[in-house]
Amino acid sequence: MRQSNWDCDLRGAGGESCQKSDGRQVLSNNTDYPTCLKRDINRQTDGTLVLETDLTVKSGSGFYIGFWGKETEAVKLVFENGFFKAAGKTLFAFPYGTHRFQFIADIDKGVAKLHIDGVWKAEIPFTGNADCIDSFRTGFAKDAVGEALLGLNFKLSKNYLVFDLCVSAVESALPAEYELYTETGKAKAVYRRYTPKTLYHVYDLTAQKETDAGVVRHFDRASGNVSFEIKYLPPEKNAAVKISLLAANRTVITLTDDGEYVNVGEQKLYHHCKNVWQTLNIEADTASQTALISLNGKKITTLAFENLTEFVDAFSIALHAQKKASVLFADMVVFVKPPYPADYVPEPLVPEKKGDYYVGINVCPIWHGGHHYGWDEITPFQENRPYLGFYDEGIPEVADWEIKWMCEHGIDFELYCWYAGQADAPMVRSSWSSAIHNGHMKARYSDKVKIALLWEASASAHPQSLDDFKKYFVPYFLEYFFKDSRYMTIDGYAIMSIYSPWTLIQNFGSAEKVREALEYLRSEVRGLGYKDLVIMCCSENVPNTKLCGVDAVHAYNWGRKGYDPDATKEYVREDVKAGYVHCVPTVSMGYNVVAWNMGRFPCMKPDDMQMLLEWCRDEILPLYKDEQESWKRKLVMLSTWNEYGEGTYLMPAGIHGFGYLDAVRSVFCKDVPHVDTAPNREQLKRLDVMHPMDRKIVLPLEQIPLPETGKVYRKFTFQTKEDFDKWEFHGFSKVEIKDGKLVGHSDKPDPYMVLKEAYLPIDAAKVSLIRVHIRANKAGHRGCCIQAYYSVTPDKKLYDSSLYELTDPNHVTALDLKVGNNKQAPWKDQVTAFRFDPIWGEGDFELVDIEFVAAPAHKTLFIDGKTIILAQYMQELDGKTYLPFDTRSDLVHIPNLYYEWHETERSLHLFGVKNAVLTENSDTAVVDGRSVPLERPMTLYDGMPLIETEFFADILGFSYRKDQTGVYMTSKNIQ
């Protein structure tokens, strides 16, 4: 998948991918085409933008970097032979190698500033005529050759007084904007890697014995409500940290930290855990001359200014060392908080519940600009588009809309997926945490919906020992979750969950050790005043849940059958019946993973969700009557709030609007008329900050199935010994022909069967899908998955070829395994090896047959002799052949092709040896600026523009021919 908002013209790089392990490569190795990496942003007409990254120029000349607006240059720098220039004027030396690079564009003044390796280098007027900025661009012009690299961390911010998130990976002395004060030689401050195993970088202030030292950072004078935030790791002993907000070198607010308490003067404000990075936030209001103090997301107190002032203009962090000591600090942010606009999120109207019920919802916090591959991939699918638009969840106003919608529909808490940033040291920051720490905890209505912890124990850093868990994870959980008054409780029990606790068995050595770890966590939570801690996990109700010391199971989602109320009832009943631990009934809307390119599947109807929730309330919850564990009869979980890629989301969106939330409200809240409100376009502009509202890409929508002939190209039955002998079997404890079926059992984790070489190859072009008639049941599980593997190469290396399918454990059913555009091995040419997995792991199966379903007659596309597999077959229309422009296929890897889709115009822009614009429903194209008539208007088929193949070849400069079975395009390099 592509990373959101980036459009990469790689023709100058011969089509080589720009995504590298150490950053984004900007490469030009020919002078036939340009190279350009473009990152769109919402159009900015005022204010100051700051771009920060590590920039490496490796070779050549002609590399450029800058900002554009409306396709017009605003300001651009060009690298030539070791120097950066602007408008032909040499600015400063920039030796080949890696440098900290900060590019500041002041739109109001039309001025840019450059800050390189911590030193101010230049201030220049804008070099272009753009009256706004809506994209960042970097690359090489057509006639330039060279290589550069943008660092892994790449930040773009606007109108912050300070926005230092320690982006650079270049270790250095203190940058010029920071000042160290101390007795000569008694202290030093540097910027360095935090630990050898992490990519994080921090500032380190180290002072010798009996030394006072500090670092101060000045910024433009600011009045109003000025927010200052800093993360710091205090020394455990023999030193005290002092953090101050300043005005003209006078202290406005000062707090100290002795490694155990945060203090103001002699007054102890807050006791914190050791081995935890503290997040201190000071909101200094120059109107009231007071400051709101928050620590780790929690409001602690309000203090009067120490000295009256109309502004603040600096902060400092200082160290009083009795013995040699260090304080680490990072992520300093200063900005003026604007007042709430008149059209801010309306205050929630919380309905009265029908009973003593609590409803939680799983939350996936990946929707923060630049932290995922998400929004672009979501844009083609209108049913997945949330009513909040393509929002940034680190914005408190976004959180307030979410909170409003949840609490107005009976949802009590958000169970946030939490990903550890590292596991072998105190965490500077956790991964994908902007939603909770910058959004929810800073939201105006944050107390209306509680928070809870869903620890993702597998897909993030996880503790390698029980000691690491106790030392680094538990203190973090306490400080950033359980100490917060907004944390979710039921009758005094705190609620949390773990995703994949089985990972901890591997880390700690046994289920018993996991139990010991969780009991330690419980004891620490009880020490905060909770009655106890309920620990759920996302799992089926199996023996290991009890052995690990988990209290309950719930579903993160129910997979593809989550849309089916009867399937959900069966799953819940099975977990209740298993009885190893408690089952929290969970309701999902389905699992339509089309946006993540894993298939289109049904979604639940709101009426079915209402019925299913009523069943949970009326039939499942009453099963639990123990007064000592009252939470069991009160708690229902929903899956999930915002998994738009996985296709399981209750957030109001295109598919059913508020339908799912209204179903929740109707079941758990008293029937009082209400009105659902959503942000208008002007309000959305404040939420959709990093993803332009109207940006959209084109992808196969998978709404139209591949056509079938109703015929079978090749069929393998299991009725005779001859049928049996066509296959080799691996990992089965028993397999035989019985009653016209292949019947087998496995007690191993990965059994499979391989088609013998004598029955290969298979012509891939003549097969549209693989249909299997099978029943399979994995012991202790709900059905089982089947999957096919194949090879299309002479080495016969097998690849996972198809999406898995879920079997019915009780009946033989027909399941279709879709084959096609696998990235590693597309379904093409000759299938040289084939493997089928009739069951995943231990269990039994009955396999009736495997059918290779015949594809209809169609032409195959060949480019430079390579077969191009498309999501849909090419179409014959009026004697012409049209290809669907499938942007998930190898079409987009043609070395001399670049494309853009412009949603507002509904037009496809193609760049090859010629440039062309095709607009939906128009029978005229624009080629190199001239109007060219088309045989028929350009239309979209299953979301993909249809392009006449000879026209396409002409744009690329390829030779062209076709026959009854194929279309052949050849580049000049091959010719």
Where do the language-model regions lie?
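Secretory/extracellular carbohydrate-interaction modules
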Residues: 22-84, 199-261
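Glycan-processing catalytic domains of CAZymes
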Residues: 338-706
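Flexible glycan-contacting loops in extracellular carbohydrate-active proteins
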Residues: 124-155, 303-328
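Primary recognition of N-terminal secretory signal peptides and signal-anchoring hydrophobic helices
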Residues: 855-975
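Extracellular ligand-binding interfaces
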Residues: 59-88, 116, 236-268, 276, ...
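Extracellular carbohydrate recognition
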Residues: 143-162, 320-331, 828, 839-852
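Extracellular glycan-recognition surfaces and repeat-rich motifs
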Residues: 2-26, 172-202, 723-740
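Short tryptophan-centered beta-strand motifs in secreted/extracellular beta-sheet-rich domains
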Residues: 53, 97-107, 112-114, 276-285, ...
